[in-house]
Amino acid sequence: MADKKEVIQNWPLETGDYAVGNVESPVAVVSLGSNMNDELVAAGAAISGPLHTENLGIEKVVANIISNSNIRYVLICGSEVQGHITGKTVEALYENGIDEEKKSIIGSPGAIPFVENLPVEAVERFQKQVSIVSMINNEDVSEISSKIDECISNDPGAYDEDAMIVEFNETPEEEFEVDEVTFSDDSAVDLASIVLLEVENRISMMNNEIKQIASLEKISSGYYAGKIEGIVIGFILTLVFLIIIIQGL
């Protein structure tokens, strides 16, 4: 059995829209624009949640992962978030790290990939502690669950170093993407662009929720559609029989 370390109290430390399972599991799941929290935690993940922003959102993901030395895999799945491109940005962070002065994620395709609250040491710890498993744009719970099982089977054991705690200098306003970034003078991103991206993100989240509701209603919708169709056919047949009877008289 793989060696494990005691998990710090109140883990995960950073708040978010996630579900928590076995905290000694080696797998953390980032489901991007999809919400499959309960299913993937049930499949064996230590933590599972969506990731909608390539700045504060990624900061929280990194902080929660490096504060649990048992996590050795970050499985990225679900639908990519358009505009923010959070999945590819996590991969860029893992592969390239950050610009120490600008605090930007090197090579990120996202619009605002700034991680103001993450020290270089935290990013380096993230890079050393975990391996990235990429299943971007895959929403098949069965396939993702199988990959979780595979990671658990190959668990290398807890990372050698103890949990690393990242303190966020966070105020209520910093929950909004507009306020969380400090731009350099040569930045080409203006306030209007950021606000538009936030609107786009909200629309994307609403679309995902609508898709989930639609999938749940699919069976009942089909049932009622078939029922209505049967009533219409019965009504037409009744009219035909009445016409035949009347003509016979």
Swiss-Prot record:
InterPro entries: MeTrfase_MtrA/MtxA (IPR030688), MtrA (IPR005778). This is Tetrahydromethanopterin S-methyltransferase subunit A. It is a single-pass membrane protein. The gene is mtrA. The lineage of its organism: Archaea, Methanobacteriati, Methanobacteriota, Methanomada group, Methanobacteria. Part of a complex that catalyzes the formation of methyl-coenzyme M and tetrahydromethanopterin from coenzyme M and methyl-tetrahydromethanopterin. This is an energy-conserving, sodium-ion translocating step. GO terms for cellular component: plasma membrane. Keywords: Cell membrane, Cobalt, Membrane, Methanogenesis, Methyltransferase, One-carbon metabolism, Transferase, Translocase, Transmembrane, Transmembrane helix. It catalyses: 5-methyl-5,6,7,8-tetrahydromethanopterin + coenzyme M + 2 Na(+)(in) = 5,6,7,8-tetrahydromethanopterin + methyl-coenzyme M + 2 Na(+)(out). Belongs to the MtrA family. Its EC number is 7.2.1.4. GO terms for biological process: methanogenesis, from carbon dioxide; methylation; one-carbon metabolic process. Residues 249 are extracellular. Binds 1 5-hydroxybenzimidazolylcobamide group. Residues 1-227 are cytoplasmic. The complex is composed of 8 subunits; MtrA, MtrB, MtrC, MtrD, MtrE, MtrF, MtrG and MtrH. It comes from Methanosphaera stadtmanae (strain ATCC 43021 / DSM 3091 / JCM 11832 / MCB-3). The keyword Cell inner membrane does not apply. The chain crosses the membrane at residues 228-248. 5-hydroxybenzimidazolylcob(I)amide binds at H84. Its cofactor is 5-hydroxybenzimidazolylcob(I)amide.
